[in-house]
UniProtKB/Swiss-Prot annotation:
The protein's name: Glucocorticoid modulatory element-binding protein 2
Function comment: Trans-acting factor that binds to glucocorticoid modulatory elements (GME) present in the TAT (tyrosine aminotransferase) promoter and increases sensitivity to low concentrations of glucocorticoids. Also binds to the transferrin receptor promoter.
Coiled-coil region list: 244-347
UniProt source species: Rattus norvegicus (Rat)
Self-association and partners: Homodimer, and heterodimer of GMEB1 and GMEB2. Interacts with the glucocorticoid receptor (NR3C1). May interact with CREB-binding protein (CBP).
Binding site for DNA: 135, 139, 142, 153
Cysteines paired by S-S bonds: none
Spans through the membrane: none
Amino acid sequence: MATPDVSVHMEEVVVVTTPDTAVDGSGVEEVKTVLVTTNLAPHGGDLTEDNMETENAAAAACAFTASSQLKEAVLVKMAEEGENLEAEIVYPITCGDSRANLIWRKFVCPGINVKCVQYDEHVISPKEFVHLAGKSTLKDWKRAIRMNGIMLRKIMDSGELDFYQHDKVCSNTCRSTKIDLSGARVSLSSPTSTEYIPLTPAAADVNGSPATITIETCEDPGDWTTTIGDDTFAFWRGLKDAGLLDEVIQEFQQELEETMKGLQQRVQDPPLQLRDAVLLNNIVQNFGMLDLVKKVLASHKCQMDRSREQYARDLAALEQQCDEHRRRAKELKHKSQHLSNVLMTLTPVSLPSPMKRPRLARATSGPAAMASQVLTQSAQIALGPGMPMSQLTSVPLGKVVSTLPSTVLGKGSPQAAPASSPASPLLGGYTVLASSGSTFPSTVEIHPDTSSLTVLSTAAMQDGTTVLKVVSPLQLLTLPGLGPTLQNVAQASPAGSTIVTMPTAAATGPEEHTATIEVAAVAEDHEQK
């Protein structure tokens, strides 16, 4: 159907419904009402309300807060997908000479690494946008990005712009907003700025006609405001005049106390619940208690710093004491080693005395020498029958040997005669032991059965005055007639020799009595000299 080329300008309010899914995955769709002003150019016929597609009209809260300082309007892109219309809210931003658009629906907390900036048909994060713009040296990306010539941080600190659904989705690591109690926020009664920005042909066509869309912003009713209407002021003044304001304040106080009491009980059990975090955030924002939170943090930080310094000083003192103890231990160890070395040098090494082999000494002349040799004797040896002469070689030197007759030895242990006995003459101050009552016979017969026994003269043995000598290691002699015999013994006996008496039984007839000297036992009698 042909239509005349007539352009008719008219402004209408179009309600556009945009399904929006919550970020937290609750699946609840929010309906946003966007007030737009359209500039329609139909090609014919009268335009009525039937030509405008208005579906799912609903009244809802505004999507965001707009600043009176934002001179540039917010661009809304309309995309038609089937029968549904979806609106995209973007903010033009700059960083240096680079320009981009901030997609508000994707601008979620904390925002620095969230891909929410459309730059040359690519969606990147604000951090990447700052790097591409050559402002990577700036530490704060919110100061590097500007919106209408104003730093993004200043806009967000004043509360004019916040993250998308920040009251529902917060990372607890953001430092983007500060509570503004100075009245910098735009009140509900403040005028809103609107500007007409034409959309691209591919992006927006309403009923087949190009449209210019603007958004009328409104302030969130929950924000802190410093200006109220006359009716509101009259309401509270009426409560005051009626005397009910005190009761209302008491109810407020009781409700707040119960809320804080329950909150205090719940925060004792970790972890912190989401509703408690939301409650704390609302209390801080609505009552301006952020400074109190900062005060608590600053006090705790100061206390921790003091404790850390004290611990550092204590640790340094302990390390110094440890070093001192180690040094003293080394000194004591060195002194101990030095003293040990000194003691080793002063203490003589005790070596075992070598065993002296017995040796024969030449006999010296004179009774004095004989007596000096006999004085060294310290024990006595008893001779008895039953042992040959060859065993006399095992008798140790320096012993006094006595012989007893077989009649005495057979009866029991031999008894030594006292030193005053006439049968026991003295030899060099020592007693020569013999049996009591025995006499020295005139004839003694010796049977030499070893090479160490030598009979000097058998004829001399008959008169009882000749000394019989055992060459080595023992000597044998007779004692009757102590005249020149002792002199000969002193000359012939070596040092350390043994003096032996050979008593025999008394003779009763003309037979010859013989005695054989044998070792019956060896007994040492330790006497004090």
